[in-house]
Amino acid sequence: MGLEKQTLRMGNGKDHPQPGDPVELNYTGYLYDESNPDHHKGKEFDSSKRRGPLKATIGAGDVIRGWDEGVRQMSLGEKAILTMSGEYAYGEKGFPGLIPPNASLVFEVELLKIKDHGLD
């Protein structure tokens, strides 16, 4: 599987985050469920909707590899599904209590801000 991106809503098509750029994202994370026809979304394990947008720096190791690579493919305002195998997520360690070792994950991600450029 590796990393796959499926666009749900197009962004502005011109502003893409680069390594070192701070970004703000809304997201919901799900365990991968092959039997679910809705983008293989399994059990929800986390969401920024309860805490507010996640702030991270692309390429700085702030987030999992699948996000570092997947979010760089997005443009400002885009909403996408990022589906990733375990090596792009939490790997052999998983995230105890939430994510099993080597688990594939599905994230619904919305890119709200790049550096100082936000949605109007």
Swiss-Prot record:
Signal peptide: none annotated. Residues 20-115 form the PPIase FKBP-type domain. The keyword Acetylation does not apply. Inhibited by both FK506 and rapamycin. Residues 1-26 are annotated as: Disordered. Keywords: Isomerase, Rotamase. PROSITE patterns: FKBP_PPIASE. It catalyses: [protein]-peptidylproline (omega=180) = [protein]-peptidylproline (omega=0). Transmembrane segments: none annotated. Its EC number is 5.2.1.8. GO terms for molecular function: peptidyl-prolyl cis-trans isomerase activity. PPIases accelerate the folding of proteins. It catalyzes the cis-trans isomerization of proline imidic peptide bonds in oligopeptides. This is FK506-binding protein 1B. The gene is fpr1B.
